[in-house]
């Protein structure tokens, strides 16, 4: 009888051990399945201090103002120096090739942490301003929609656009309106992103030349964001820079109302790709590169989780900061003149109203999130160079 009881006890112990092992296996599988979502962003890579020496090539009409706001905020909250335009300038010498003397306060030993204002890339001169360990990145947009945006925004500035009644008309016969000899005023009218990288926008789209220039960009720029996939791009940027989530959360800035966006026919889109063939090759290449990097470093499941975290935090901040659920406002509806964006050409540039009654600390956070780039540049200039006259933003007095 005793031996039978002993046998039963051993039997139940074995069963309990098997159940315990099965439970542990199931738990391990559950934890592994959630690892992509719950692991901190920097899991699987060497951790370290946040990157603070950064050069962002701010291309035109590519969501770059939103990225600029991210960098300005990081610089201000971390007490970093910014390479700001000298004197009364609002850009770093654009459309001429960048020279170090376009930066306020530059000297033989002076180096800055962050450079992100509009310039035409010129590496030897940039290296006179930025440290050797600088992280270089930029952003591109589908050239069809980048050109459409430029046509509206620079309609009254670029000679090629002034004479064209519509983008359809311009692209139907671009040489009627575009003159190579006036390209410094017409930089927005053909291969503008290619131009911003320091290349010739009127060069022939020959395979060897294009590949050599793209390789040149790849050697210098460690990341190229894509405007159509901005949230995914910001997730990867955050990973590369080792920043906190709030550092890369941003609201859309310098965006247009829907009524000022032209609908383009398939024929017009194809003409735009052909006219801006160099931009198209650049965009195609780095769009593929971005997704290859995302797959390699994050994987689809983890990427979805990180993008949702970013969007959820943006919604939280919008609820905290913005009136009317964060609806974009026409500039005439923005109560605080310091938050009104600059209006250009035929574009209707939108902005935000902040919720009333915010405490001072929250108000400061929210103001930085929605501050247009010219006002923010003037703010940083005053903080960085208190002994110099304030930057003048003329349209604020209008």
From Swiss-Prot:
- State if Coiled coil is listed as a keyword: no
Residue ranges annotated as Lumenal topological domain: 32-398
The cellular location(s) given in this protein's UniProt record come to: Golgi apparatus, Golgi stack membrane
> Care to name a GO molecular-function term for this sequence?
sulfotransferase activity
* Source organism phylogeny: Eukaryota, Metazoa, Chordata, Craniata, Vertebrata
This protein is called: Galactose-3-O-sulfotransferase 2
Q: Which UniProt keywords apply?
A: Glycoprotein, Golgi apparatus, Membrane, Signal-anchor, Transferase, Transmembrane, Transmembrane helix
Regulation of activity is described as: Strongly inhibited by Cu(2+) and Zn(2+).
In what way does this protein cross or attach to the membrane? Single-pass type II membrane protein
> Which residues bear sugar attachments?
79, 132, 179, 287, 330, 360
Top EC category:
transferase
What are the annotated GO cellular component locations?
Golgi cisterna membrane; membrane
Gene behind this protein:
GAL3ST2
The family assignment reads: Belongs to the galactose-3-O-sulfotransferase family.
Topology, Cytoplasmic side: 1-10
Q: How does activity depend on pH?
A: Optimum pH is 6.0-6.5.
Q: What does this protein do?
A: Transfers a sulfate group to the hydroxyl group at C3 of non-reducing beta-galactosyl residues. Acts both on type 1 (Gal-beta-1,3-GlcNAc) and type 2 (Gal-beta-1,4-GlcNAc) chains with similar efficiency.
SUPFAM superfamilies per record: P-loop containing nucleoside triphosphate hydrolases (SSF52540)
Instruction: One Pfam family, please name it.
Output: Gal-3-0_sulfotr
Q: Which organism is it from?
A: Homo sapiens
The EC number(s) attached to this protein equal: 2.8.2.-
Q: Does the keyword Membrane apply?
A: yes
